[in-house]
Design a protein with these regions (language model features):
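Short hydrophobic alpha-helical segments enriched in small aliphatic residues
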Residues: 6-9
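Conserved alpha/beta enzyme-core scaffold
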Residues: 16-450
Length: 450
């Protein structure tokens, strides 16, 4: 009997390997209604956030309202139409958010949603210690790879901890979701139900808000950053403006809770290369990303990025291990003693505590580190941001004892180690010129001698 030639043997082996590969990645997708049927009245449901907000499943969850009552929704920064946050669903779903994004701001301030003030670094402990035990987690992931692993993509943040502690896990599986290196891999066998969709991820554009004023602020902040520093940026136009002012710097690193489009060009030009970081050298470390599709495509399967758990990334003890750590954050207003309100306008809840204090403290105790608050001297409507006292009901996110540098378009005020009078003088010097006389008067009335 003639033996098969070498080519036939190789073809046969290849077909067997292909069959095994296909068997490994076979996925049984179900309908949204079937997946969501596990959710019952009086349960607590975690919703994935930021770019990965699972809008497709949320739309279908709203259709399940007729059978649900008192379902608590826990999330951080969600984007897009949530569908379940409408007043008509107030008896069915109750949002208990750990941050206030634009999508739920009206609901929180209208009284049919709630906000939990908490440091981002501590949110996983709320899940682990059963203070906020999760019954069901809904996450938005990439399809399984050859080994069955899906990725939480550009939103690992608190989602990893929610998955680790939830009793049931529902996955919205999307080929448009990027795969990232780090802590975001979850084997598909962990999911109790998987629903397929092809929605685009949520995007945000911070660069369009940058103007001459914010670029001036960016320039002053850039002047506080030395070569070989490791930087953290908050969300918004000012952190993005800072990145635009770093093109003459060398060998910068990134350890941040979030990143956006501004880092791409700096990475491409080798300005951000992470060479001199004390921990995770050669890696841009983040917990989530929010920006354009270009950003998500750039991060996709890019080993130069590591997306890690929020309780690690935002841990001040981890942050401080990078020497020359620079934390750059913004605020709503600052009083003349240095108290920083970043989450509210008076009693109006605008955002949340977030990770500002995590990084302000971590940078302060880093060797050569600098915690920076950067704000325009006035709002777009001409309202002063440096004020005698914070608005009644305003929340203090960063205490005056934690504030070191404050930057406006008029310069830099260094507050650490200064007494209250000295702080007031320093802050008045960077306030809007038209606000300084009134601030001087307030300081004289408060401190008597000024």
């Amino acid at each position: 009997m003639a033996l098969p030639d070498e080519n036939h043997v190789l073809l046969f082996i290849s077909l067997i390997a292909l069959k095994k590969k296909l068997m490994k990645i076979t996925v049984n997708y179900v309908s949204p209604a079937e997946a969501l049927s596990v959710i019952q009245p009086n349960q607590r449901v975690f919703i994935h956030g930021s770019a990965h907000t699972p809008t497709y499943l949320l739309e279908h969850l709203a259709k399940e309202a007729y059978r649900l009552q008192n379902v608590e929704i826990v999330s951080i920064s969600v984007y897009g139409d949530l569908h379940i946050d409408k007043p008509e669903f107030k008896d069915n779903f109750h949002i208990n958010s750990l941050f206030v994004s634009a999508s739920i701001r009206n609901a929180v301030n209208s009284g049919y949603a709630d906000y939990v003030p908490v440091f981002l670094s501590e949110i996983p402990e709320l899940f682990k210690q059963d203070i906020l035990p999760i019954d069901v987690a809904i996450v938005h992931v990439s399809p399984p790879d050859d080994h069955g692993y899906c990725s939480l993509g550009v939103s690992v943040d608190i989602a990893r901890s929610a998955v680790n502690t939830a009793r049931y896990i529902i996955a919205q599986v999307n080929p448009n979701a990027p795969r990232t290196h780090g802590d975001g891999l979850i084997h598909s066998s962990r999911f109790h139900a998987m629903v397929y969709c092809e929605d685009d991820l949520h995007t945000a554009n911070f660069t369009e808000k940058s103007g001459p004023e914010t670029l001036k602020i960016g320039g002053f902040v850039a002047g506080l950053i030395d070569d070989r520093c490791t930087i953290q940026m908050g969300i918004g136009a000012i952190p993005d403006a800072v990145l635009k002012c770093l093109y003459n710097h060398k060998d910068l690193g990134v350890h941040t809770e979030m990143c956006s489009d501004g880092i791409i060009d700096l990475v491409e030009k080798d300005i951000i290369n992470n060479k001199y970081k004390n921990i995770h050298p050669n890696k841009t470390v983040s917990s989530f990303a929010l920006g354009s599709k270009q950003l998500y495509d750039y991060i996709n399967d890019n080993p130069a990025f590591a997306f890690l758990d929020i309780d690690y990334v935002n841990d001040p003890h981890i942050i401080r291990r990078n020497n020359k750590m620079i934390a750059i954050n913004s605020a709503v207003e600052i009083d003349i003693t240095g108290q920083v309100c970043s989450d509210s306008i008076g009693t109006y809840q605008f955002s949340g505590v977030g990770g500002q204090m995590d990084f302000m403290r971590g940078a302060a105790v880093s060797e050569g580190g600098k915690p920076i608050i950067a704000i325009p001297s006035r709002t777009a409507k001409g309202v002063a941001r440096i004020v005698p006292t914070l608005k009644p009901g305003a929340g203090v996110v960063t205490t005056r004892a934690h504030v070191h540098y404050v930057v406006t378009e008029y310069g830099v005020a260094f507050l650490w180690g200064k007494n209250l009078r000295q702080r007031a003088k320093a802050l008045i010097s960077i306030a809007h010129p038209d606000d300084r006389e009134a601030l001087d008067k307030s300081c004289f009335e408060r401190f008597k001698l000024f």
